[in-house]
């Protein structure tokens, strides 16, 4: 193979790699920026397309959840010292992972269980994916807050809270219209279903705490019996 042919092969490989990179960037822009922004700007129409045209993707929703977990962990280490109110020694990555997915899962099943009583049209997968997309503004708000926290002065600290607060507000805003569109409800019925969802979440949390306490007491009882037997007979 001549030097000219070698050069052509290298250029061909580089071209293919570059095309793959461009394709990946195009997908990232479309799935993680353009469409979520479209939903945020036009929530009714956006979530209607999300449901009817199957534009919402589960892997994108899960990615937003993972990104939020990553940002929560990064906040322990890299938030500016003026803003930071957390103790890095108390960081538990496993707890952060479980917390986000547990919250989204509980809200999903609580909402689904309530809306089945009110003729809701949303499926579990659709509700879960919708909640994941609703994390879009919070993710970018946390990223912006994390970056700006290292440049803010004491007098500007409130700006950090404003950024995070705006992200939470937009998340709730998207979630409200998401529930309306996913279940094809009117305003009153949607508000009623959200109140029912909150009640269902409290019930699930109560049962979860009760179950955890019961398991803890049972394990303690079994351990006590084992200790008594081992001291007497072993």
Go through the PLM ranges and name each one:
Residues 14-18, 56-68, 127-134, 188-196:
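Alpha-helical membrane-anchoring segments
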Residues 17-19, 95, 170:
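A short linear-motif detector with a strong N-terminal bias
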Residues 21, 26-125:
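Selected alpha-helical membrane-embedding segments in polytopic membrane proteins
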Residues 56, 79, 86, 137-140, ...:
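Hydrophobic alpha-helical segments
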Residues 108-209, 213:
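Hydrophobic alpha-helical transmembrane segments and adjacent short intramembrane/lumenal linkers
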